[in-house]
Curated annotation (Swiss-Prot):
Annotated family: Belongs to the globin family.
Keywords on record: Cytoplasm, Heme, Iron, Metal-binding, Muscle protein, Oxidoreductase, Oxygen transport, Phosphoprotein, Transport
Span of the signal peptide: none
Enzymatic reactions: Fe(III)-heme b-[protein] + nitric oxide + H2O = Fe(II)-heme b-[protein] + nitrite + 2 H(+); H2O2 + AH2 = A + 2 H2O
Binding positions (nitrite): 65
GO biological process, one term: removal of superoxide radicals
Principal EC category: oxidoreductase
GO molecular function: heme binding; metal ion binding; nitrite reductase activity; oxygen binding; oxygen carrier activity; peroxidase activity
Protein's job: Monomeric heme protein which primary function is to store oxygen and facilitate its diffusion within muscle tissues. Reversibly binds oxygen through a pentacoordinated heme iron and enables its timely and efficient release as needed during periods of heightened demand. Depending on the oxidative conditions of tissues and cells, and in addition to its ability to bind oxygen, it also has a nitrite reductase activity whereby it regulates the production of bioactive nitric oxide.
Name used for this protein in its record: Myoglobin
Top-rank lineage group of the source organism: Eukaryota
Length: 154
């Protein structure tokens, strides 16, 4: 399930584009997540009241949280699969405090892929998409394993 060096390079190349505008990308990812899977919005007390897309776009808190999410994910991706130290506190908080099911991580992974396809079509071809999908699946599988260790059935 691991990625080759070439696959990691494809992932990190497009991630460089994401880091140039973490807020914009993060906001777009969360909007796609909430619009595509409205049930996920219920996990966010800060954002539950945001029903319309224009309200979401106007929310600085949503943009800040999107930046936080993608900053954490970027730190994990840059570890090229050697992310146990970065993953542990994230799994802990998402299992015990936020209670985020693994299914929701699948949903946000889909949103990330869609945003990258939309914003960077020239840099996110089929090979890069496949590599990113694989990297996000590795992340989800490792989070799920940590959840199990913590006794969270998410």
């Amino acid at each position: 399930m691991g990625l080759s060096d070439g696959e990691w390079q494809l992932v990190l190349n497009v991630w460089g584009k994401v880091e140039a505008d973490l807020g914009g990308h993060g906001q777009e990812v969360l909007i796609r997540l909430f619009k595509g899977h409205p049930e996920t919005l219920e996990k966010f007390d800060k954002f539950k009241h945001l029903k319309a897309e224009d309200e979401m776009r106007a929310s600085e808190d949503l943009k800040k949280h999107g930046t936080t999410v993608l900053t954490a994910l970027g730190g994990i991706l840059k570890k090229r699969g050697q992310h146990a130290a970065e993953l542990a506190p994230l799994a802990q908080s998402h299992a015990t405090k936020h209670k985020i099911p693994v299914k929701y991580l699948e949903f946000i992974s889909e949103a990330i892929i869609q945003v990258l396809q939309s914003k960077h079509p020239g840099d996110f071809g089929a090979d890069a998409q496949a590599a990113m999908s694989k990297a996000l699946e590795l992340f989800r599988n490792d989070i799920a394993a940590k959840y199990k260790e913590l006794g969270f059935q998410g």
